[in-house]
Amino acid sequence: MIKIAQRVSDMSESATLAMAAKSRQLKAEGKDIISLSLGEPDFKTPEFIKEAAKEGIDQNYSTYMPVPGYEDMRIAIANKFQRDNGLKYQPNQIVVSTGAKQSLINLILSLVNPGDEVIVPAPYWVTYVEQVRMAGGIPIELPTSIENDFKISPAQLKAALGPKSKLMLFSNPCNPTGTSYTKSELSALADVVADTEDFYVISDEIYEHISFAHKAESFAQFDNVFDKTITVNGVSKAFAMTGWRIGYIGAPVEIANACIKIQGQYTSGAASISQRAAKAAVEADPEEIRFMVDAFKKRRDLVVGLLKEIEGLKINNPEGAFYVFPDISSFFGKTNGDFKVNNATDLSLYLLSEALVAIVTGEAFGDPNCIRISYAASEAELIEAISRIKRALEKLK
């Protein structure tokens, strides 16, 4: 028997990818599955981006790339940070990676020593705590609730800080809740960070353009924490480019250089043609993708309205990303025949078998009372899926 490394045994499988794989398997078996499990836009990559990729092929961008990204790509990203976020990063503070997920692991491996504590507001994206553990760090989860729109308070952050605290890692707008912090809310958190020595923030802003109630705010905009903040972003969500695999960071030079060193031993530079396509994306006026954002907002309103009609569900109004995160704890302890729902994982499996709808348990995101539903699907699919969910939940007694 092959002995796999303990770090792999200690690692949880990505719940979102696992549910997506299960959905594909059932579809292949002929089941009429509606999958609302993955965080992937259902739009096509815009034509102007695909044209940039074709030009890259014709111009023979086919050799090894600089590890941190092409120079003109880093310049384009620095310009994007200035234009969209008011952040003054220089090109040597930019590192381009094979997706924002790689950007995150580069940063965590660069900053976290074994035993360091990393504060992670919960709910959180499933990968955060696993990457922290891979580096030998200790995730410190800060619980939130649907009643306060899943936001942490400055007092809560301050109380969590200790001698081993090294990082706070969070997304804004948030996956899985759709929560979007206001400028004043971030400013209050920034004041706590600024007063804490040798403590940094990784601000995952991959959903920045998919924001409904107000402009998504960057944590690094505040002067007192600019040098303590690493901004993570990418092109996957806003530009429907999940398969192109381009993410990037803006960071203090020392941290950027550490990420370059790590990336040079892992993957080297991100794919050349993907960089040419992503350059066109980051240089584009955000209005180029307004139609997608408007569609997501319309779907958000549709899904929230339909879910509010289901007795027993508790739901807030997400302000960004493309997820809803309803509290389903009122169904715990109920049964349908031989199937008993004890927790959110049970409920997600019940909905898959009874309603043929794939969603993701909130336990994977650090909240055992909720489920994540992605509305990155057509309106017709969403209406049918919520109808199935409603019928299935009504059968629980």
Positions of predicted regions on the chain:
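Conserved N-terminal alpha-helix of the aminotransferase class I/II PLP-enzyme fold
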Residues: Y64-S97
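PLP-dependent class I/II
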Residues: I2-I4, V8, S12-S14, M19, ...
